[in-house]
Amino acid sequence: MELLLLSNSTLPGKAWLEHALPLIAEQLQGRRSAVFIPFAGVTQTWDDYTAKTAAVLAPLGVSVTGIHSVVDPVAAIENAEIVIVGGGNTFQLLKQCRERGLLAPITDVVKRGALYIGWSAGANLACPTIRTTNDMPIVDPQGFDALNLFPLQINPHFTNALPEGHKGETREQRIRELLVVAPELTIIGLPEGNWITVSKGHATLGGPNTTYVFKAGEEAVPLEVGHRF
């Protein structure tokens, strides 16, 4: 399988997806036809989200079709060379994909060789479940099971920082709560600016910041760039 799982879409001082474009270009390998899954977008229309994505990827020679705009979305996915899943609200994303019967077709086409690109919520959707999202559950997705393209759980936008005076939980504390009730999980705290690529049977960590892996009953382990999962 070929996957590009990004923690986020924007870095300080850079345009939207600018940091991801070289990574995308490297994994295209001749692929040019993409379907875009915009369903995580809540405060922007799906048409606008699709147009924004298409404009960014046009210089790479990638044509983008919004999955919400086609008559037969399952067929569009089955014929896609690239599946792109944008960030936003993960619960809304999973709900729409489940209701439209898109989860199995996405899994199948990626396993057959299509490239999967997802950022934030799109990275969460590639995991076994969406239980490590940071998002508010604004809708009920009728279960948390997701695509299971990547075998570990990703927590995107990972940071353990707390504003001064804030009394809520740190991100690690929230991850530890999940590991109490689901100790079988391995959770990757993927900070902004980092990504995981899956190519030719290898999953590799990239990016400038320290990523952490969390397991039940163990201290968090820092992972360096180039780590293979």
UniProtKB/Swiss-Prot annotation:
InterPro entries: Class_I_gatase-like, Peptidase_S51, Peptidase_S51_dipeptidase-E
GO molecular function: dipeptidase activity; serine-type peptidase activity
GO CC terms in record: cytoplasm
Primary subcellular site in the record, as a coarse category: cytoplasm
Enzyme active site: S120, D135, H157
Record-annotated disulphide pairs: none
Keywords: Cytoplasm, Dipeptidase, Hydrolase, Protease, Serine protease
Catalytic activity: Dipeptidase E catalyzes the hydrolysis of dipeptides Asp-|-Xaa. It does not act on peptides with N-terminal Glu, Asn or Gln, nor does it cleave isoaspartyl peptides
Keyword Ligase part of the UniProt annotation: no
Enzyme class: hydrolase
GO biological process assignments: proteolysis
Subcellular location: Cytoplasm
EC number: 3.4.13.21
Stored SUPFAM superfamilies: Class I glutamine amidotransferase-like
Similarity field: Belongs to the peptidase S51 family.
Role this protein plays: Hydrolyzes dipeptides containing N-terminal aspartate residues. May play a role in allowing the cell to use peptide aspartate to spare carbon otherwise required for the synthesis of the aspartate family of amino acids.
Protein name, UniProt field: Peptidase E
